[in-house]
Amino acid sequence: MKPKDVLTKLEAVIGVTGGPRRLRSAIELVLQDSFNLLPLQALEKAELLEESVRDLIAEEEETAPCPKLTLVSSAEHMVAGYCYPNPSDSSEIAAAKRSRLNIDPLLQEIRNLTFQEFELFGARVLRELGAKRTKVTPHSDDQGIDFYGILSLGQNSFLPPPFGRLAHDVRLRFAGQAKHYPTTPIGPEMIRELVGAISLARHNVFTTDDEIFDDLELLPFNPLVAMFFTTGRFTSGALDLAAKSGVIAKSGEELAVFLADKSVGMYDDKGTVKFDKTRFRDWLSSQ
């Protein structure tokens, strides 16, 4: 068996809320229960696999949109569920962990949207990023761009005073595509289409004379962030092309994590954070 296969079984056994335990002992149990090794065989194999599995957990904590496990003690190689409530957590981290327990129902509700609603969802996410002016383009004539928005940096109080004064008149543009493909991965050709559409928009080249992008006010040297949202996932080729071309590509799971961390659609029920479809829909339709 490969370390990745063992990690997958560990994630299922421990779960996102599982308490701390020794990694090697957890691997031993998985090897016996899921791979039918005898106790002595499992003990020897766990010793060989421990470092590799630990490295995979650390890597997923850094790169995965929604890691399942976390390393809680490097000295003894202890592991726990990623959302396990640690007494040392700050109030912000504790709240984020409670919200992340609702990622699955939140993702399912995102996938339940119609393709028109998912384009509106793209514009709504821009508002969560701070954009004040957002718009969804007409579906029949979107010129390869489904949604866009403008963020005025001078309106954001998080900027330090010197930079805030310098950036007062800077307006950051966002433009993107939203593809409702829950089961079909996004390939590099779709990333290429978005890059081409934005390149044409920069030069004011469109297939019609409609002025649907006038609100974007895109000039040759305006800063613009290209975004691609999907309810599903991306192929490795699409992610590679997005990284090389500067496109921010977000899968359905990554979008669900982003919204869960902002408590979208969440409410507190006697200390338990729960997801509510109506609250999510209210958020989607709010201006």
Segments from the language model and where they lie:
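Mixed-charge (Asp/Glu-Lys/Arg
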Residues: M1-Q287
